[in-house]
C-alpha cells in the first residue's frame, strides 16, 4: 500500500523558539542508572511520573539542556491488513535541521500547554499532532508500546519518546506538510535497505517492531481513539 501524498517523520517539528513544551527532569524519569534504547515494561509508572512531575518550559531554554527531557508522543503508523508501515524522509524545508534527509518511522511532536486543557497533556498532544501532521479519513487507534531514550545524538539527548503504535481503521494515510516530508508505506523487510539512513529513534523502533511490538500493543496501558483527520 502506498500513501496518497508524501509523508511525515519524527515529532520534533514545529520548532518555534517562543513555545512552551512539556518537560520532565532527567533525574526524575531516570532516578537510578540511565538506560539507552526502548523500555516496554513499567509504562504505567512512567505515565504517572510524567503526569505528576512534568512542567512546561520555554523551548529555547531546554533545546540544548539534557537535564530536561522534552516529552514527545511518537507515532508509528501500521496498516495491519497488509502489515505495512509508514516511512518518511525529512526534506530541507523541515524545521529540525539536525534531521534533514534522514528516514523516520515516527510522526509526532512536542506537548504544548493547550494540549492539557481538555485531555491528559500526553493524550492531548498526541491527538493534536495527529491532526496537524497526518491526513487520515478514517478513525485510528493509538496504543502506547514503549518508552524511548537515546543519548548518542544531540536531538536524542534532550527528548524522551512515548512510542505509540497507531492503526487506522481503513484506507491510506498521507501527511499535510509535503514541502517538508516525503514517504511511503512498505513492509519491514522492504524498508531494511533504509536502516542505516534512519534517525536513531527509528532504528530502535524498527528493531522493536521486528521483535513483536504489534502483538504486545494489545496489552498497552494507554489506548487513545483518534478521530478522522480529513
Provide a role label for each language-model segment.
Residues 15-16, 66-70, 156-158:
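A short catalytic or substrate-binding loop motif that flags glycine-/basic-rich loops and adjacent residues
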Amino acid at each position: 500500500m502506498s500513501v496518497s501524498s508524501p509523508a511525515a517523520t519524527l515529532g520534533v517539528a514545529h520548532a518555534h523558539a517562543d513555545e512552551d513544551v512539556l518537560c520532565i527532569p532527567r533525574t526524575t524519569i531516570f532516578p537510578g542508572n540511565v538506560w539507552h534504547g526502548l523500555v516496554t515494561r513499567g509504562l504505567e509508572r512512567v505515565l504517572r511520573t510524567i503526569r505528576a512531575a512534568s512542567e512546561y518550559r520555554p523551548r529555547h531554554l531546554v533545546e540544548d539542556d539534557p537535564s530536561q527531557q522534552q516529552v514527545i508522543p511518537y507515532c508509528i503508523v501500521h496498516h495491519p491488513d497488509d502489515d505495512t508501515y509508514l516511512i518518511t524522509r525529512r526534506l530541507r524545508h523541515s524545521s529540525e535541521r539536525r534531521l534533514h534527509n534522514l528516514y523516520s518511522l515516527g510522526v509526532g511532536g512536542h506537548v504544548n500547554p493547550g494540549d492539557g486543557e481538555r485531555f491528559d497533556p500526553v493524550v492531548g498532544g498526541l491527538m493534536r499532532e495527529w491532526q496537524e501532521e497526518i491526513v487520515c479519513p478514517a478513525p485510528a487507534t493509538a496504543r502506547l508500546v514503549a518508552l524511548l531514550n537515546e543519548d548518542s545524538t544531540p536531538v536524542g539527548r534532550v527528548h524522551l519518546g512515548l512510542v505509540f503504535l497507531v492503526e487506522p481503521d481503513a484506507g491510506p494515510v498521507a501527511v499535510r506538510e509535503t514541502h517538508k516530508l516525503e514517504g511511503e508505506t512498505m513492509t519491514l523487510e522492504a524498508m531494511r535497505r533504509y536502516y542505516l539512513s534512519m534517525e536513531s529513534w527509528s532504528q530502535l523502533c524498527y528493531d522493536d517492531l521486528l521483535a513483536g511490538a504489534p502483538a504486545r500493543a494489545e496489552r498497552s496501558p494507554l489506548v487513545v481513539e483518534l478521530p478522522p483527520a480529513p
